[in-house]
Amino acid sequence: MDFQTLHQLSKTELHCHLDGSLSLSCIRQLAKMIDRKLPATDDELRRLVQAPADSENLGDYLKAFDFVAPLLQTKKALQLAAYDVVEQAAEENVRYIEIRFAPVFSLAGGLSLVEATQAVIEGLHQGMATYDIMAKALVCGMRQLPNTDNQTMFKTTAPLLGSTLVGGDFAGNEADFPTNVCAPAIKTAQSLGVPLTFHAGECHCPQNIAEAVRLGIPRIGHATACFDQPALIEKIVETGTTVELCLTSNLQTKAARTLAEFPYQALKKAGAKITINTDNRTVSNTTLTQEYQRYQQAFGTTAVDFLAFNLNAIDAAFIPDADKKSLRDRLHQDYATYC
C-alpha cells in the first residue's frame, strides 16, 4: 500500500502522550499565551521539542519533554493541547484514541489535580464535537515520584472516571524505578477501580514486564525487552495481555537497538495481542500513518494485520462494550476494500 492508502485506513491508538504530541503551531500558540519567546523557524523549534536522532537512552529522550511542561499550566492551555492532539489524530483517520497525561506536571500555575484533569477532558470534548473521532483520557502516575504522590493522584482523579477519563498509567524513569517499586500505587489504583496500562520493558528489563503482568495489569506499554524471552511472551499470550508497541520511539531510545531487538515478530508469531502506536508524535517526529508505513517496510505488515491490530486495540480499550461494537463494525466496514 502506498502512503496515501495507509493514510486513508481507519486507525486506533492506545498509547499517545499529550505533552509529547503537540503540533508546532500549538506550541507556538501556547508560548504566546505566556509571552515565551520561541525560535523564529520551525526547524529551530523542532530541535527543542524533538528527541535527538542520537539519543543514547530513554533518559536522554525524555529531556525533550522539559521544554513543553511550562506551557501546560493553565486550563486554557490544557484544553488547547488536548484539542490539538485530537485534531492531528482525526486528520489521519484515527477513529479511537486514548491520550495520556500526568496531571501532576500541570500544577505549577496553581491548578489542582482535578482542574488539570477536567481541562484535558474539556479539550477532548471540543475535539470530538469537531471531528469524527472518539477520544478518551488516561492519567499517568510518574514512577520517579513517591508512591504517596501517585496514590494521591489516583484517589483524587478516580471520581472523574466515566465517559471521557477512562483509566490510568505509570510512566517515567523505569531504569531507576522498576515495577516492584511502584506496586503500592498500582494496587491503590486497582482498588479504586482504575483500569490500568503500564510502561514496562523500555530499558532492557524484562523483569519489569513480568512483574506488571503478575500484578494483573491488562495492557503493557512498549514491552520491548520481551523480544528474546519466549517464556515471558508465552505468559503475555496466556494472560491475554495487550501490548502497545511503539516502533519509532523504541529505536530512538535504544530500547531496541536494532529491528531485531523489537518484539513485533516474536509477539505476532506467538499470537499475542499487538497494537501499533506513536507514543509521542512530536518528540518522535512521527504519525500513526508513518508508523504503519514503517511496519509495512520493515516487516511486510499487511492490511489484514493492521485490521487485526486495530481490533485488538478496541478489545483492550477502556470503554463500554456498546462503544467497542460500533467501532469494530466501522473498522470491518472501512477495511472491506483492503482485506
Curated annotation (Swiss-Prot):
Q: Which organism is it from?
A: Lacticaseibacillus casei (strain BL23) (Lactobacillus casei)
Sorted alphabetically, which keywords does the UniProt record give?
A: Hydrolase, Metal-binding, Nucleotide metabolism, Zinc
Query: Which of this chain's residues are annotated to bind substrate?
Result: H17, D19, G172
Which cofactor names does the annotation list? Zn(2+)
EC main group? hydrolase
The note on the cofactor says: Binds 1 zinc ion per subunit.
Q: Name one Pfam family in it.
A: A_deaminase
Its catalytic activity?
adenosine + H2O + H(+) = inosine + NH4(+); 2'-deoxyadenosine + H2O + H(+) = 2'-deoxyinosine + NH4(+)
Q: What is the lineage of its organism?
A: Bacteria, Bacillati, Bacillota, Bacilli, Lactobacillales
Q: State where Zn(2+) binds.
A: H15, H17, H199, D279
Q: Which superkingdom?
A: Bacteria
Please give the name of this protein.
Adenosine deaminase
Family as reported in the entry's similarity comment: Belongs to the metallo-dependent hydrolases superfamily. Adenosine and AMP deaminases family. Adenosine deaminase subfamily.
